[in-house]
Amino acid sequence: MIQFVVDETKCTQCGQCVRDCVAKIIKQGDAGVPHVQAEDEARCIRCQHCLAVCPAAAVSIFGLAPSNSVPLKDDSFPSLGDMISLVRGRRSVRQYRDENVSPDLLRQLLEVLGNVPTGVNRMALTFSVIDDREAMRRFRDKAYRLIAEAVKAGSLPEHTLSYFQGAAEAWRERGEDIVFRGAPHLLIVSASPDSACPQEDVALALAYFELTAQCAGLGTVWCGLMKWAMESVPALKEEAGLPPDHSYYAMLFGLPAVHYPRTVQRDGAGHIRRIQA
């Protein structure tokens, strides 16, 4: 049961919920009040657009009342200039302070991930986080030990052997953390294989997390080396507790130990191609 309910004392019969329903299951009968037939409920993709679009706050669904939603005003979103500055000013951070992100901030960042877009609104994402620097230290130590064991056993793919051999030696001999960059936290987003587009869902979630985290003053970096290591050393993926059939990617984050007072300069316009229909 999707519990689609319309408060008839508020409903103006404007039809916006009908027009915006992607599954086209909301209908207006002779009385003009929107409704959903029981046999159509299985087609609902649970997007809640009907609740969000109703100007009179007359629609509730899944037992969720519109009064509990966040009101959106003209100035609720960042300005275009703010977004351009954020995208241009976002940097991959590879220097971190040896401190935990505050639990309250981390909670906010993780909770908002429930709002990231996913294909067909499947929302089949798992967010695996290391939220404490001591836990990260232990995970880092285990990761380098597993990498070193794989190097010694000769079980690494040839194209990764020299790189991870160097990374393991740098950690063992100099304490240089090439893979995790000394970050106190790690987020791995994974998607189940029954997702409509698992790889895209994972990338979108991390992109949203990155921009939100950097707005909160945190540093982030996409950890392709972590994924490379997990693919080369399966025991490391098991150590992270990831389901074996999930698509995944990782991001390091924490309080930055570096500040960038200006953007870099890139000419992206040269890569724009207009399609002439």
What are these regions (language model features)?
Residues 122-123, 180-184, 215:
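Short gly/pro-enriched beta-turn/loop segments at secondary-structure junctions
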Residues 71-114:
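Extended interfacial segments that mediate partner engagement and assembly in macromolecular machines
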Residues 12, 109, 113, 185-187, ...:
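Small-aliphatic-rich amphipathic alpha-helix that forms the alpha element of a beta-alpha
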Residues 16-35, 49-66:
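Iron-sulfur cluster-binding cysteine motifs and their immediate structural context
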Residues 112-114, 170-175, 234-238, 257-260:
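Glycine-rich, charged/polar anion/phosphate-binding loops
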Residues 36-53, 69-88:
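Short microdomains enriched in Cys/His and/or Lys/Arg
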